[in-house]
């Protein structure tokens, strides 16, 4: 379908070899077999994934006996040149296999970015003395083996950190970095995710302050209004609210206030740091011009952002003992 023919958000075009299954028996074009294609892209997930619903009348499932070696090539978009997703995925699961008729069946094929499979099969045990942004780049290039064109954006982080990645998967380590990194405004809002442009490591503040790439249309479609062609290209069927107000949950999870307790095993000193929601909130940019941070006084006439014992985070004793034993062995070796 050419660019000029696209007028509705429900329309799309499949480029040549747009939905191709690469198997040990060769390439199979699924353009005439798939009934539904769903691609999941979220800033809260490390990589892209999805499902494709197949109506199989040629016994493809029996011939292939899916074993994880299959790759799905997707080249699809609103037009041939706009909003195109061009990427290869790994088939990792088959489910919901149902007989439709005597000679036909339907099933779901689940796919995920190939880096996820590599991450599940790998681990990182390494000490770093660098910024979190440089650590992220090292993991992406040397452990997930990503070329530069697959790394879309890595935002610079503040400070040099000494950390040890403790024999965990690359995606676990990237999540570890995102939870601890801060930008130059000391905003702890880093996220690691993948979209159609590649892998990203940046802050919510930067995304909020950036100019919108497109506008989503929630209105009824195909109204025939003038100058409505652009709005029709990108639409949403519905909005799902995934998080709602829960005061008790916010208190116990340390949203309003908390206390960090750190133990230095070399000096045997204990350090405490109070963390206030108002303090952290001020470091980040926000979508609302008049943000509501939810400050109120409790029965003791104290602001909820000053109740630092609501949640305390501290190092577990078992890790301290383990690290102390490792330190003793290192001293003996010296």
Could you describe each region identified by the protein language model?
Residues 133-137, 174:
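Extracytoplasmic/secreted envelope proteins and their assembly/folding machinery
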Residues 120-124, 211-214:
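Short, charged, solvent-exposed linker or helix-capping segments at domain edges/interfaces
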């Amino acid at each position: 379908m050419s660019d000029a023919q696209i007028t509705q958000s429900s329309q799309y075009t499949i480029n040549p070899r747009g939905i191709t299954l690469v198997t040990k028996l060769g390439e199979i074009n699924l353009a005439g077999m798939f009934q539904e294609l769903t691609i999941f892209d979220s800033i809260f997930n490390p990589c892209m994934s999805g499902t494709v619903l197949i109506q199989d009348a040629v016994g493809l499932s029996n011939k292939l006996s899916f074993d994880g070696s299959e790759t799905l090539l997707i080249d699809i978009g609103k037009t041939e040149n706009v909003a195109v997703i061009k990427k290869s995925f790994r088939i990792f699961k088959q489910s919901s296999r149902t007989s439709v008729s005597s000679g036909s069946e339907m099933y779901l094929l689940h796919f995920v970015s190939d880096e996820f499979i590599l991450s599940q099969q790998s681990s990182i045990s390494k000490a770093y003395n660098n910024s979190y942004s440089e650590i992220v780049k090292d993991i992406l290039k040397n452990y997930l083996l990503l070329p530069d064109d697959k790394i879309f954006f890595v935002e610079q982080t503040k400070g040099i950190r000494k950390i040890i990645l403790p024999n965990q998967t690359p995606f676990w380590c990237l999540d570890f970095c995102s939870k601890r990194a801060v930008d130059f405004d000391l905003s702890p809002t880093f996220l690691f995710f993948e979209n159609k442009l590649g892998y990203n490591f940046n802050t919510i503040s930067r995304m909020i302050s950036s100019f919108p790439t497109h506008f989503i249309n929630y209105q009824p479609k195909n109204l025939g209004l003038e100058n409505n062609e652009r709005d029709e290209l990108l639409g949403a069927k519905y909005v799902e609210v995934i998080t709602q107000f829960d005061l008790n949950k916010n208190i116990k999870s340390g949203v309003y206030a908390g206390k960090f307790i750190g133990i230095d095993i070399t000096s045997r000193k204990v350090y405490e740091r109070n963390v206030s929601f108002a303090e952290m909130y001020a470091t980040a940019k926000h979508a609302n011009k008049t943000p509501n941070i939810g400050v109120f006084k409790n029965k003791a006439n104290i602001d909820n952002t000053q109740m630092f014992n609501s949640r305390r985070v501290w190092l577990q004793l078992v890790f301290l003992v383990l690290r102390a034993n490792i330190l003793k062995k290192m001293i003996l070796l010296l």
